Amino acid sequence: MSSQPRGSGTQPGPSQSPISQRNFRYEPARSGYTSPGQYSTYSTSTADRVGCLTAVRMSAFAKLSRFTRRLVHIRQMDFEFALWQMLYLLIQPSKVYKNFIYRKRTKDQFARDDPAFLVLLALSLLFSSIFYAYALGLEKIGFFTFFLWSVFVDCIGVGVVIATVLWWVSNRFLRKVRDQDVEWGYCFDVHLNAFFPMLILLHVIVPILYPTLIDSPAFLSILLGNTFWFLAACYYVYITFLGYTALPILHKTQYFLYPISFIFMFFVATLTGGWNISRTALNFYHSRAEPHKFAPQHGGL
């Protein structure tokens, strides 16, 4: 009877090494944002099926519904924090985006879930419209028309277009991880952040100075008025750059600064050509708010 050496069936040979039997596979780069339980539940409404170690990832529709519900509950809005954000957008905008990163780690979203900032921005547009109504000599109906255009077209409408374009560009070309993408709501928040300093420059300072210092064909008047438009555009681009640079899932965000070069060349061209941008803009605003005053008159001889 032949006997087999003890342990001969259990000792692996050179080709049977546990290390050589491991299956190695390529793992794509990840963002590092994981739930405590290393998995998440994708929810479209409530979190009744979620355990204590599971993070909830709400759908875009669920986030929008929650945002809309809070829009009609004034007591749930944190206006004090929204005012703090507005202040630091003027003096230290990079500090504002640190809160967006904290929100991602605690609520699994970069975008704001509190509509207080949007409400205060609309109120700012309401009060700034008073300055334009005075500078343009608008009537009551013209004032409200100007305000509605400013909110729903200049702020929200243009913001939706810009946010959609940058959302697509960021996810298509600038994303360096696969397990996270840029939220459209965050892109719209970046637009609102960049829009507020522009509002202060163009909707407060320009209409105040326009009747006395800007509304003139003199070079200094053109230089002063066009400088405000140049600064507003550069500030918008810079805060937009900061917003996308704050996302750890993106790279090559320096591309967002490239428009500043074209803005500067356009600024120099307007000064060389003697084009008063403020005059053109205010005439356009006036014709939009009170179109009946700019309608062509058809009268017989």
Swiss-Prot record:
GO CC, alphabetical: Golgi membrane
Pfam families in UniProt: UNC-50
Topology Cytoplasmic: residue spans: 1-115, 164-193, 243-254
Regions of this protein lying in the Lumenal compartment: 137-142, 215-221, 276-301
Keywords recorded for this protein, A-Z: Golgi apparatus, Membrane, Transmembrane, Transmembrane helix
Transmembrane residue ranges: 116-136, 143-163, 194-214, 222-242, 255-275
Top-level taxon: Eukaryota
One GO biological process term: regulation of muscle contraction
Family: Belongs to the unc-50 family.
Role: Required for cell surface expression of acetylcholine receptors in body-wall muscles.
Record's protein name: Protein unc-50
The organism's taxonomic lineage, starting at the top: Eukaryota, Metazoa, Ecdysozoa, Nematoda, Chromadorea
